């Protein structure tokens, strides 16, 4: 990236504010002391599976708006949310339209791995230094990307049909049962999971 040089001593890049997600903090990063211009959050998180409550996510939205930062919110695993206090989108938080970009993928919820279909939400209300980020994104995307193939678009459309929603629900339940089996097996083998 364009953040700075790689520091071999601490194995970090200069110009990046690292936000540790550790077992001791529930795999949820704390608000940084330094002021970032860009914040990346992924919830539910991969690989930890940690999910953020709406109240905690609201703290991040408020922090970003207060400090003029933009949140890149990766919601690829939102279909796996089972808790009621966990938002499925950052836009469930007040003020998120002025500070957040949300990424979605069909790979995780619909099994489209390798098909390469997803979408990005860049609200028109998101403006930095007098520039609407939506307009920049639309221009960049319009000149660099020719769109997903028609058959892939139709498959994505089917995901939102009543039949597609039912099939996705079954698929996610199947994956969750598999995860539960692995979890129980690791616990029985003496691992801390």
At which residue positions do the language-model features occur?
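A Trp-anchored, charged/polar loop motif used as the substrate-binding/catalytic surface
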Residues: 24-26, 183-186
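Substrate-binding/gating loop at the entrance of the active-site cleft, primarily
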Residues: 1-13
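Residue-level signal for pocket-adjacent positions within structured domains
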Residues: 11, 47, 75, 85, ...
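Short, well-ordered coil/turn elements that cap or connect secondary structure elements
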Residues: 11-13, 33, 66, 95-98, ...
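Conserved core segment of the aminotransferase class I/II
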Residues: 93, 97-176, 180-185, 191
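Histidine-centered beta-alpha loop that forms part of the nucleotide-sugar donor binding/catalytic region
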Residues: 1-3, 21, 76-77, 107
